[in-house]
UniProtKB/Swiss-Prot annotation:
Transmembrane segments annotated in the record for this chain: 11-33, 56-76, 96-117, 130-155
Organism of derivation: Kalanchoe daigremontiana (Devil's backbone)
Record keywords, A-Z: Hydrogen ion transport, Ion transport, Membrane, Transmembrane, Transmembrane helix, Transport, Vacuole
Tissue specificity field: Higher expression in leaves, followed by roots and weakly in flowers. Expression in leaves is light-dependent.
Lumenal topological intervals: 1-10, 77-95, 156-165
Cited function: Proton-conducting pore forming subunit of the membrane integral V0 complex of vacuolar ATPase. V-ATPase is responsible for acidifying a variety of intracellular compartments in eukaryotic cells. Necessary for the crassulacean acid metabolism.
Topology within the bilayer: Multi-pass membrane protein
Residues at the site labelled Essential for proton translocation: E142
Complexes and interactors: V-ATPase is a heteromultimeric enzyme composed of a peripheral catalytic V1 complex (main components: subunits A, B, C, D, E, and F) attached to an integral membrane V0 proton pore complex (main component: the proteolipid protein; which is present as a hexamer that forms the proton-conducting pore).
Protein name: V-type proton ATPase 16 kDa proteolipid subunit
Membrane-side (Cytoplasmic) residue stretches: 34-55, 118-129
């Protein structure tokens, strides 16, 4: 590395790994949730086409999960500038844990939204009273990803606090 580099030379690897983990895992959850609940919407649309727009809620909720990963990835990547200020292993590990917290929470929420959305829209076609219950379960599943986003922001903000620069 050049002499203008400040901090630990391997630390940015962990920081960028955290940004990648946040985006990749969150988008995997979003893709799974969208695909799984989308199959349910398509299957239900054959029987009850008038309910397709009402049943698109799980697909939208799953798609939002990717945005959470994008937010954390941008926060992490803007915090990695070793030439401007020192970037140590503590910072890299903080960013890695931030990305993993948000990404894995998004992955698990996407799986939950996909499974609940698939079963929920199919059940809604048979019994419309189940719609409210499906929405409540989807909200609780989405909250899992929000918890990961909040913890990711907190962990990412810890980067740079290990020293008095």
């Amino acid at each position: 590395m050049s002499s203008t580099f400040s901090g630990d030379e391997t630390a940015p690897f962990f920081g960028f790994l955290g940004a990648a983990a946040a985006l990749v895992f969150s988008c995997m959850g979003a893709a799974y949730g969208t695909a799984k609940s989308g199959v349910g919407v398509a299957s239900m649309g054959v029987m009850r086409p008038e309910l397709v727009m009402k049943s698109i809620v799980p697909v939208v909720m799953a798609g939002v999960l990717g945005i959470y990963g994008l937010i954390i990835a941008v926060i992490i990547s803007t915090g990695i500038n070793p030439k401007a200020k020192s970037y140590y292993l503590f910072d890299g590990y903080a960013h890695l844990s931030s990305g993993l917290a948000c990404g894995l929470a998004g992955l698990s929420a996407g799986m939950a939204i996909g499974i609940v959305g698939d079963a929920g829209v199919r059940a809604n076609a048979q019994q419309p009273k189940l719609f409210v219950g499906m929405i409540l379960i989807l909200i609780f599943a989405e909250a899992l990803a929000l918890y990961g986003l909040i913890v990711g922001i907190i962990l990412s903000s810890r980067a740079g606090q290990s020293r008095a620069d």
